[in-house]
Amino acid sequence: MERQVPRVLLNSGHEMPVIGFGTAIDPLPEPEQLVSAILHAIEVGYRHFDTASAYMTEEPVGRAISEAMKRGLIKGREELFVTSKLWCADAHRDLIIPALKETLKRLGLDYLDLYLIHFPVRLKKEAVSLEHEIDDFRFEDHELLPFDIKGTWEAMEECSRLGLTKSIGVSNYGTVKISQLLQHATIPPAVNQVEMNVAWQQKKLREFCSKKGIHVTAWSPLAGIGAFWGSTVVIESKTLKEIAAAKGKSVAQVALRWIQDQGASCIVKSMNKDRMKQNLEIFGWKLSDEDGRKIEQIKQSRLYPAKLFINENSPYPSLEALWDGDL
């Protein structure tokens, strides 16, 4: 049975479902597999789909949307919220609008609901394609260019004015970089999509974004299980296991419910039909204040440092520089 997912009102005036279906999957499934998974996700109630140029999943997402309309699973495009992201090699002022148009072409859509800057990083256009990131991969220093916060955002604003996307935002931005962006913005970011879970709670960043009217979306809400950088720190959490047992819920449901209780939304990934459904069963109940206090005590650690952008001769010679000291 299809479930109704609540929506949050963004500062752009548009509403976004608070759970999205993520497509940053490694290893990359066969296109038909992903199309089938997205169709099932639509059947059980997902209405927000998150992709990116770097994920190489835009075409299957678009095919699934087209097929869903043909099958009558949705009445029209407007029932869905589609997010994609600007890759770093396209983060040049004159390349951003063409990059978004290419994304729309791959998706077979006239507009996005949300377009995000994937990282506050600019690469040379000819930089190596990020097909399969591995732990020791690094971009060469000559591939990493100074990031133009002002010019990049001005082009994102133009994407919005042209009607190519309804909302614009950022991803993996810390407080310093958001502050710098806001000095120049005429349209503020609607969303900051960041690593966030019970083991990396991002309290400082969330409070900052809230004051600025920017909604926070959590990627890796279950700590990236299956990714080379991922961890079982959430799923194997003793604290979450105890809370889950007491409430008759799964650990994953408790972890996702905690994110909702913080006023954030999340992007979940699963090709498993049962888990797809379970990940939507987090509404109609809440964690207690005592549960929240216990979760606050969980040891904190960033799981995905994005070392691929760190080079002593690059704009980000250290992780501290990339993440605004928030490690």
Curated annotation (Swiss-Prot):
NADP(+) binds at residues 220-279. It catalyses: ecgonine methyl ester + NADP(+) = ecgonone methyl ester + NADPH + H(+). One of its GO terms (biological process) is ecgonone methyl ester biosynthetic process. Keywords: Alkaloid metabolism, NADP, Oxidoreductase. GO terms for molecular function: oxidoreductase activity, acting on the CH-OH group of donors, NAD or NADP as acceptor. Strongly inhibited by Cu(2+) and Zn(2+) and to less than 30% by Co(2+) and Fe(2+). Expressed in young leaves. Detected in stems and flowers, but not in mature leaves or roots. Expressed in the palisade and spongy mesophyll tissue of leaves and sepals. Its EC number is 1.1.1.334. InterPro entries: AKR (IPR020471), AKR4A/B (IPR044497), Aldo/ket_reductase_CS (IPR018170), NADP_OxRdtase_dom (IPR023210), NADP_OxRdtase_dom_sf (IPR036812). Substrate binds at H118. Optimum pH is 6.8-9.8. The active site is at Y55. It is an enzyme of class 1 (oxidoreductase). CDD domains: AKR_AKR4A_4B. Catalyzes the stereospecific reduction of methylecgonone to methylecgonine, the penultimate step in cocaine biosynthesis. Can also use 6-hydroxytropinone, tropinone and nortropinone as substrates, but not 8-thiabicyclo[3.2.1]octan-3-one (TBON), cyclohexanone, cyclooctanone or N-methyl-4-piperidone. NADH can substitute for NADPH, but with a decreased activity. Belongs to the aldo/keto reductase family. This is Methylecgonone reductase.
